[in-house]
């Protein structure tokens, strides 16, 4: 009754009665009640983890612990509960040899996205299209997250680069202060009357000696054909030509290559278009 739901204890009992603490609140009447019940049942650690999993898809358990600055066992407990509630989903890469914990990576589900969208008071569909999170949407193969999963090794590699930067950040030394993942990094611009788009593998901000430097990451695994590489670099060149930057504000393009030979290939391609 309304009287019973007055105050925190009543809401807590209601969320428990619809099964929000053990699962995805299956006894809730409709999706709005389901999201409301899960929001009450979630812990503060779960809410933080859900946002990280949405912003940075395909992180492992230990990588989530690094991002959240928590112990692995704390993250594991939050993951187990969130998976049971249908907010987080485990993904195993296509080249994985076994089902060890390090092979399993995690993504936000559609239900998790609906919960975050409701908290921001934004329709879920609009949030899925324009928000900073990538999540499993329906059963199709379209969408930001589905693309990242298809490019599993590439996505995981780019994530690892930023995570290594984060782990090696030192007080007084170079420090990674900002990271926008590939799912949250799209630059649209106009060059010579033509609309163009750049999609780096992430954006970072490094601070050293009080100076901030932004960069775009291109994680090059050496598998891209030269024609594709040239076309990608040409978009960056067009962006730089069409913009005026104040001192120190120009974002640097950082291409990480797997071998010295591939680095030579990238340099020659850059010289051809810049």
Predicted regions and their residues:
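Short, solvent-exposed loop/turn segments at secondary-structure junctions
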Residues: 56-59, 95, 113, 186, ...
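Short acidic, hydrophobic short linear motifs in intrinsically disordered regions
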Residues: 55-67
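Residues within the helices of the helix-turn-helix
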Residues: 51, 62, 80
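Pre-recognition alpha-helix immediately N-terminal to the DNA-recognition helix
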Residues: 44-51
